[in-house]
Amino acid sequence: MGILSITDQPPLVQAIFSRDVEEVRSLLSQKENINVLDQERRTPLHAAAYVGDVPILQLLLMSGANVNAKDTLWLTPLHRAAASRNEKVLGLLLAHSADVNARDKLWQTPLHVAAANRATKCAEALAPLLSSLNVADRSGRSALHHAVHSGHLETVNLLLNKGASLNVCDKKERQPLHWAAFLGHLEVLKLLVARGADLSCKDRKGYGLLHTAAASGQIEVVKHLLRMGAEIDEPNAFGNTALHIACYLGQDAVAIELVNAGANVNQPNDKGFTPLHVAAVSTNGALCLELLVNNGADVNYQSKEGKSPLHMAAIHGRFTRSQILIQNGSEIDCADKFGNTPLHVAARYGHELLISTLMTNGADTARRGIHDMFPLHLAVLFGFSDCCRKLLSSGQLYSIVSSLSNEHVLSAGFDINTPDSLGRTCLHAAASGGNVECLNLLLSSGADLRRRDKFGRTPLHYAAANGSYQCAVTLVTAGAGVNEADCKGCSPLHYAAASDTYRRAEPHTASSHDAEEDELLKESRRKEAFFCLEFLLDNGADPSLRDRQGYTAVHYAAAYGNRQNLELLLEMSFNCLEDVESTVPVSPLHLAAYNGHCEALKTLAETLVNLDVRDHKGRTALFLATERGSTECVEVLTAHGASALIKERKRKWTPLHAAAASGHTDSLHLLIDSGERADITDVMDAYGQTPLMLAIMNGHVDCVHLLLEKGSTADAADLRGRTALHRGAVTGCEDCLAALLDHDAFVLCRDFKGRTPIHLASACGHTAVLRTLLQAALSTDPLDAGVDYSGYSPMHWASYTGHEDCLELLLEHSPFSYLEGNPFTPLHCAVINNQDSTTEMLLGALGAKIVNSRDAKGRTPLHAAAFADNVSGLRMLLQHQAEVNATDHTGRTALMTAAESGQTAAVEFLLYRGKADLTVLDENKNTALHLACSKGHEKCALMILAETQDLGLINATNSALQMPLHIAARNGLASVVQALLSRGATVLAVDEEGHTPALACAPNKDVADCLALILSTMKPFPPKDAVSPFSFSLLKNCGIAAAKTVGGCGALPHGASCPYSQERHGAIGLDGCYSE
């Protein structure tokens, strides 16, 4: 706010500023409002504190003035008194309980204000009343920062004596020393250093004291810091030294001092720039550059991008500095990593005078830069005609004819038609740049207007793409072909139709136009682009030409939203309707809708009869506009009669499905309001999903509310019987769920597996949703069993998935529901899926009621935990008195289950901690050792053997008379066989097929019989008993006829034929799977 007129203020304030005590007393006696506010909410007390009249202030305070009143800047009278340096007024305010900690909008206290305004006496009065002198304002500055900033030595000294911290930092980590150095308060700096301040301190960006002093040109501070031993070449966070800073800001006196003190003139920063680079580019760095050059700076030092100081001078056209650099040996054709020389840079930025200097000093005009461009390429690309003229006049190729051979001998310069790495000549660049003067200069110098680049484009293509009317006229007049196609089949007309898109963007500079001027410039360019297109059409450009994808210029205009261009093309094209309605590959209507160009879409909608044409995926333009969320395009299409019920081919989605799935509420509203069908909101896709279901699946609450308000059926089910409520339970969106329940959605609806939303909420762990559903279910059907078709309840699912919050809620809601449904209890589910949290909760809540419960196959939770190798589950179950040797219907204990499944951790725990009984037999008389060997679980078998020396267990036979040794041998468990033999396992025992453990190693019965014959022949019979019972049992089932002989021996006794059964006897008979 500006300066206020005193005559506009209340009489009381006028009397205060007049210092008229009697008038003030008179006004107060007349009940004048003592706390009246001005436009900035200042009270008379603020005015009195500012003026500093103690008697008036006493009158006001005695009359009840608000001592802590705040104005619009939150300044109190105490702040005003401190700013006025009036210690008597400040003392009087303090005596009347003024808040010494009051903060203004910058978080500054009265002490900050006193320090900033050199009010030493005020600061002295305030300091004892504060708990800390280091309180920071909004920028993190303490009172000491402000005192140092003001340069008042006495105040600084006072604050230090009162205990202010020397090294306190603001939010940019700047200490008071930084401000002393920056502002040149040398005496203050000396005082701070004498009190122990750190001379090597740095702020967040690594600026030290020497950097800050150099930045502001504080030469005396710089000299003092150097005398104090400051590191002269210390870099900041960007690698810049104090010399870099001085050169960048043109502080030549500081630069001289630093150089004389031995600063490294060639030290690079993080980007590889030396102080000379910085001096070359800075606004006021001319003297610094001369200083550096005279003191040995390397004029050819290249940055990380390969730029020399001459490159930097060329960027801003520093003519004098470039001359100094050249005179001191700067390489004239030094190339950066892009290949650009200083001449390229000068041409790019249009510095004609510098170009002259460089060329005079021998710069190579034919040197290739970025993309193999000449300097001339860059000059014409950016539209610098004077630079173009200069380069052409001094650098173009010329030749000398030899008088003897009559041959042309190259003398100097470059060929104007030489292409860059992408095949573009200077004429291509000029056409792209849009400067017709450059274009004319090149054409008059012999540039080939029919030359094509690597993409098959002529200069006319580039002129058309940039909407350059004058360049297009010049090129066509000179003979350029208007219908020539590039490698993609695009003619200049295609590019002109989309010219706003292809136009080269202008770089924004400090002197850029404001928004209004920018808009005028854009409008001017749009008009020029339109004239360019019109000119091409008038000069024979064929609008029916298609590119290699089948697109015409109409397609391009629609895709890039150029309404005027589109209207012109539709008007000029003889077969416009055929082009517009063609869906090969995509119609213009689809392109405009997909890209959200509503104006172009409106033009097409007014031209077409049928707006429901579909692309190869069956999508209409309305579908694309809806999917992309272009509400304006949706509005245009629906207003012109486009159907919202046409389905795409894959998922059979309509535009309504697309809008709901993407959350485009406004588009969805327009589609529903089109009134195409009464039940439009319940249209289904290929899976039976309605828009409401998709909106809920993606959590779009606004769409859900809209669909329900417009009549969408809340209980509609898809092909699997799942409703919107099922989906809300899965996603956990409480707002969506509440909306459905408000519209009477049925809570206990079941899908094809009998699962309700309550099941799904429990499985997904959405506690808040589950609570809401349970409350709704009570009012719907309190007697519903709540189990699915497999007998599983929500409690089963919560336990299985480990969602303890949901389980706790279910236990509170229905503590006996664990008895309902499948006998494979929630505890079974928790332990088999390694869910410790829900296991612990179930055991804590139900304990003995559930710990030994059995499923349909007689298995306890301990069996399930063993099967899943869940050691923590086993531990918790045993702690709650689970029966370690309980058997299922097949007679197996938890240990046997673990052994058969190969769960080594469970076997180890049950053996060592659970002390499980190893002698228990199942229905086929298998022990845990039999089962471990039968499945090849070597580690489990060895663990069991390590716990027993019982020969009865080691030689125990099952119903097929097989010992563990038989089974281990048959499965190739060498270490188990060795352990069994070392513990006394018999090798002569035979199973029901007459096989010893050795013969059990055979892969099948026939091999075993052959092996038995060979063994019987190799070992002679004892003399007293030629045919022992062992040999008889060994051979009785060999299957060889008695009449046959072996190796000349007689027929074997009892050699009756016995056909071998391919199926072994069911000695093991394990089901091996816990999956339900």
Swiss-Prot record:
Organism this protein belongs to: Mus musculus (Mouse)
Record-annotated membrane-spanning stretches: none
Protein name: Serine/threonine-protein phosphatase 6 regulatory ankyrin repeat subunit C
Assembly information from the UniProt record: Protein phosphatase 6 (PP6) holoenzyme is proposed to be a heterotrimeric complex formed by the catalytic subunit, a SAPS domain-containing subunit (PP6R) and an ankyrin repeat-domain containing regulatory subunit (ARS). Interacts with PPP6R1.
UniProt cross-references to Pfam families, sorted A to Z: Ank (PF00023), Ank_2 (PF12796), Ank_4 (PF13637)
Function: Putative regulatory subunit of protein phosphatase 6 (PP6) that may be involved in the recognition of phosphoprotein substrates.
Keyword tags: ANK repeat, Phosphoprotein, Repeat
Ranges occupied by ANK repeats: 7-36, 40-69, 73-102, 106-135, 139-168, 172-201, 205-234, 238-267, 271-301, 305-334, 338-367, 371-400, 422-451, 455-484, 488-545, 549-579, 584-613, 617-646, 651-680, 687-716, 720-749, 753-782, 790-819, 822-852, 857-886, 890-920, 924-953, 960-989
Highest taxon of source: Eukaryota
InterPro entries referenced in this protein's UniProt entry, alphabetically: Ankyrin_rpt (IPR002110), Ankyrin_rpt-contain_sf (IPR036770)
Modified residues (Phosphoserine): 1028, 1075
Species lineage: Eukaryota, Metazoa, Chordata, Craniata, Vertebrata
